[in-house]
Amino acid sequence: MKAVALALFLAGAANGYTGSAACGQCHQAIAESYKNTAMARSFRAVQPGIRLPEFDGRAFLHQASRQTFTPVTEAGRYLVSRQQSTSGFQPFRMAVDYILGSGDHARSYLHKAPDNALLELPVSWYARRGGYWEMSPGYDRAGHQGFTREVNARCLFCHNAYPQKNKLGEGIDCERCHGPGDQHVKDAKRASIVNPARLPAERSLEVCLQCHLETTSGDLPGSRLRPGRDVFSYRPGEPLGDYQQYLDHAPDAGQGEKFEIVSSAYRMRQAACYRARPEKLGCTACHDVHRQMSRAETVAKTQQVCTSCHAQTQHEPSGDCVNCHMPTRETEDVPHVEMTDHKIGIGLRPFTALVRRDDVPYGGDVVAYYPPGGTVGITTAPPLSPKRKDYTANGQALLRAGKVTAAVAAFRTAVNTRPEVADIRVNLAAALIAQNDYPAAQEQLEEAIRTGPSIEVARGAWLAARKAGAPLPTAREKYDDSLRTQMLSAHSNLGVVLDHMGDHEGAIKEFRRAVECDPSSAAAKQNLRQALTR
C-alpha cells in the first residue's frame, strides 16, 4: 500500500535541481531583492523569531457553525483554538507549523501531523481593512471540514519550490522559473540554464502560466495531468500542454465572466489588448519578477506599456490606466480578497463579486481550454436526485446496529454507484474487517488510496489490513502507531474497531475525541450516543 498523504518527503522531485542557495552565490543582487517578493514569501515554516502579530488572542465567532476561533501565542508557538458554542467539551487546539501565502492579500496556516500530512487550519488572516480573521477559503459554511482538510501536492505546486528528498521548500525559488540548476552551477555556462526572457513568447509566458493560469477552482477538474506526468514534472521551456491539459466550462454555459483568485492569466487572455498582440503583452511586460515593485513603480511601468499602443487617447490621461481599465474587486471563490482584474476593458465592472453557488453542481459540458481544441473525454454528472437512496448512510446505520452482512451489501452498492469516492471504499473496508475478511478489506483500502486525492480516511483504523489476516489486537497496535490525533475520522474509525473488539470503554474514549475534533459532526455524536446507551 503506497503512501498517499501529502508527498511532504518525496524521493526527490526532480534530478538536476540544486536549490536556490547555490544561485545566490553568483547572482547576489537578484537573490537579495527577490527575497522580498510575494513569490519568495509564498510558503515558509514557522521558525523561532518569526513574528505573527495577528495571533493576538482576539476571538472570532463563525455564525454558521456556531464555533469560536481564537488565535493565540503560547510558549513561543502559534495556535488556533476552537470552541463549539453549544458543546460542553474542552476547546480543541492545533499548532501552526507552516504559513501559506505572502500576506500581501492573505495568510493561511498549516499544521504538520505525525504522519507528515499538512492540515489546513479553518481560519485565515486577510490583509484588507488593516487585517482581520475570517474563515479559510471553502470553510464559510456550517458543515466545514474543521481541522481535517489535507493540503495535497497540487495545492503546494503554486506556493513552493519543488520538494527535495526529506526536505520541503520555502517559497517559489529560482528553479521554478529557470529549471534545474545543477548543470549550470557546474558549467557556469549560460546555455545550461533556462532564461525565460530568451524563450519564444509562448514558452516564456507558460513559465508564468504554470501557476497563474486556472480556469476555475470550482466544480470542474480545472486541469488534468498528461498520462505519465506527475505534479512536479513540469520544466520551464517545455510546452505547458505536454505537462497538463487545462479544461473549462463550455462557452454556452454562461461562465465566461467568472473572476477568481487565480484568474489573472485567464482574464488577461480574454482581453482585446492581449489578443491583438500576445507576443508583447505577457506578464513581464508589467511585472518585475525579481523584486517587489512599489505602487508608484507599477503605475509608471503599466502606463508606459499602455501608451506604447494607445498614444492617442479619448480622454485626458490620468497617469494611472490600471485604476479604471483594470480595477480591483473581490474574487468569487475567496470573498475576502481583492485582486486586479486583468481583463483590460472600458467601463466599470462591479467591485463586489456575487457569492458563487458551490452548492449547485455544474452539469454541463467540459471543453479543452489550453491548449485549445481536441477531445477532453470528460463529462460532468448532473445533480443527484434528492430521491436517490443514500447507500453509504444506510450501510453506516446497519454497521452501527451490528448487521454486518447487510452493511457490506449496502456499501458494495454504494461503491458500484460511485467507484471514484475513496470514503465509500473505506466504509466497506470497515464492514469487511467486522466480518474478519481481511484480504477483501485490504483490496478496498488499496483501491481507495489509488482513487482518492486525500487519504486521511484510508489511513485510519484499518491500516493493519495491509497484512491480510492480521488479528484485530494487532490492528489496534498498528493504528495507534499511525494515529493522527487531530482526525475526526481517525478517532471514529478506531472507536469502531475497539467496539467490535469488545473494548467499549476504549470506544467511548475515541468517540469523545472525535466529537471534540468536530462538535458539529452528527455522525460523531451519534457514535458516542449509541456507545453510551449500550
How would you name each of these model-derived features?
Residues 417, 451, 482-485, 517:
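Structural marker of alpha-solenoid helical repeat scaffolds
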Residues 387, 421, 454-455, 487, ...:
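Residue-level recognition of tetratricopeptide repeat
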Residues 392-396, 423-433, 459-463, 488-496, ...:
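Conserved alpha-helical positions within TPR/SEL1-like repeat arrays
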Residues 21, 29-102, 108-113, 122, ...:
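Primarily the internal scaffold of c-type cytochrome electron-transfer domains
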Residues 400, 434, 467-468, 500, ...:
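Register position in tetratricopeptide repeats
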